C-alpha cells in the first residue's frame, strides 16, 4: 500500500461526544450531518420584543448544508414541538417554529421578517444552511429556567452522489458519505468520484454494496451491514475525519494507480492458496503488533444510541 494509504489506517483520533448542546458563540466551526441524529446548533440571532419583552426570537443554524428533514424539537430533552411543528404540553401556545432545509434558493424566514422587519430582512436567507427560527413567549411554567437547551432531530445531507443510480439524495451508506466528504473541494480533499486523482468508481460501488448488504437479526428481520449516522465538526483535520468515517464500516482508503480506492470491511474469497511449497527455506517469522503478554481477549465499544436519548452507550 502507498504511504497515503498507510496514513489513513491508524486508530481514529476523534472522540465519542454527544452533539446535544446549542451554543451562542461569535465564531464556531461548521457541522456536517450524515444520516440521522439529534443535535444542537449555533444561535446566530437573538432578540426580545413586545410591550414587556415577552417574546424571544432565536435563529439556530443546525448544519452547513441542505438536509432531508428537520423533525421534532426538544427543550431540555423533552419534546416541545413534534415533527409537524405543533407545540406540546406546557409549551402549547408558547412557542412557534419556522424551518429551513438549507436549499440553494431558500428565502428568509417569512414570520420573523413580518414580526421584526427592521431586524430580519429578505436578505437574511441563510442559503445553504439548515436552520430553525423559534419564537418563545415567556411563561413561568413553560420556561422556569430561562432559555432552554434546544436540540433537534435531523435527517442529514441529502445531496450525496450514488454512482450506482447516477443520482444524488439522502443516504446513510458510509462509503457514499465518505466519498461525499472527500469529494468536497472546500472542506474535503477535492477527490471527485470518477475523475483523475479522484475516487475510483468501481471500488466505491463495491464498498457501497457491501455496506448495504442485509444482515439477519436474531430477533427477526434484517439491517444494513454498515450505516453512517452522526455529526462531523469541520475544525478537525481531513485526515482525522476520514479515519473516523472509515471506522464506521471497517474501511480502508488507499491511493493507488492515480486514484483513491475505498474498501469496506467484509470477507472476500481468497485469490490464492498458500502452502508449504510457497515458503522459503528457513521458515517464517511472525511479528505481531503487540506482545502476547499485552494482547487482549475482549473488546468494548461505544456508539451514540437513539435509544439512550442520543448519548454514548456501550455495545
Model feature map: region roles:
Residues 2-247, 256, 309:
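Polar, S/T/G-rich
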Residues 267-277:
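Short, charged/polar, Gly/Pro-enriched secondary-structure boundary elements
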Residues 74, 153, 263, 302-304:
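Residues in well-ordered beta-strands of folded domains
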Residues 78, 265-267, 306:
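Solvent-exposed coil/turn segments that connect beta secondary-structure elements
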Residues 13-17, 268, 295:
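Surface-exposed fibrous attachment elements
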Residues 72, 250-254, 259-261, 300:
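Beta-sheet entry/capping signal
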Residues 83, 254, 263, 271-272, ...:
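Short helix/loop capping segments that flank catalytic or ligand/cofactor-binding pockets
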Residues 65-69, 276-315:
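Acidic, small/polar-enriched beta strand-loop surface segments
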